Structure formats: structure tokens, C-alpha cells
Amino acid sequence: RSPNRKTRSKKELEKEPSGISVIPGKYKIVASFGENSDTSEIEVVYDPRVDVSIEDLQKRSTFLKEVEEQTSKMNSATSRLNKIQDNIEVLLKLVDEMEVDSSLSEIKKRLKALNDSVVCLEKLVFGIEDVKGYFDQPETWQYSFRELYYGSYSNYGEPLQNQQIMLKEIKALTFNTTAKFNRFISDDWVGFEKYLIDNPIELTKRIETIENK
């Protein structure tokens, strides 16, 4: 799956993820429904109008698997960030609905700072949100990946040299971006979790009993 700015709904998660096209050959298909399953064999043949060798198709397939691996890594990273953002939104709503005291004010301040950090990390991947009109953001991971993705999928032969260079660049960008995500999670978010342990949010206020004489 491609990285997503927000947590996917249950309905979205139920959709089957797509992948690269298979190379020509014989394959076994397994269909399952509940406890029942059945198998069948199919043979995939390539478009005879396209002059490309099996060797080049295999090289292309191997290359595209490396491309998809970067998608998987970034999807895993953004999914973690989305879960943190979901938690922040829930906690902010909870704090806003309670009586404000000094401890809650500090928690709210920390939550807003964490949310700002999440937004900054999101921009590294997706860029600025809700931009009207045509606006390129070449510094983002998504822009660089799309350049590689569309160029690679439109080439049906052996990967070109410029595609190899772009893959190397997106690997480095994926590594550096996920490293920043990891630092935020291990330092900022875990630090906030420890702060909550030491300064728990009181979900209810003590209510005195009615004096009855």
C-alpha cells in the first residue's frame, strides 16, 4: 500500500492491496471463502506486440520489487505517525472537555507541540496539504517517488540508468525520512508517554457527598 496522510478506515483496509504485474509463466491460483478453498492453474502470456525478452522482464520485475519495498517502508512509517496523531487528537479533545488546571495546561501545551512535530514530519513525505492550483513540491518524498514510479512502470524493458539513479536516491530519502520518524517516536512521543505516567490525567473530579443531617 502507498503511504497515507490519515489512518485508513476499516473499509479501506479491507481492499486488496495491488502489486506489480507478474512475468509470463504458469501460476497456481488459490481462491478462499470462509473455510472453503479451491486451486486452479493459469498461464500468463505477454503482449505479443511488445518486443521484449523474458530476461529483461525479469530484470524489470526485480527492479519494481525494490521500488515497492520503499513504498512499504514509508507506508509503515506514516501508519505509525497516523496512530500517534489519532492519539493526540483524542487526548486534546479530552483535555478541552475537562476543567482546566495547571497540570492540564501543561499537557495541552505538550500535545500541541507534538502535533506540530507530526505536521512537520508529514510535510517531508506529502508536502503542504490542501494547496490550490498547480504547485510542485520536489523536495518531498512523494514527489520523488512518483517520478521514479511512473518512469519505471512505463518502461517495459530493462531498467534504464537514470531509473537506477532515481532508485538509489529514493532509497536514501526513505532511509533519512524514516530515521527522523524514529527519532520523534523514540524521543518525543515516548518521552510524552513517560510524562503521562508521572502526571496522569484525572478523568473524573472528586465529588463530595451531600451533607444529610
Where in this protein do the model-derived segments appear?
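Mature extracytoplasmic or organellar-lumen-exposed domains after removal of signal/transit peptides
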Residues: 26, 33, 40-42, 76-213
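Glycine-centered tight-turn motifs at strand-turn-strand junctions
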Residues: 1-18
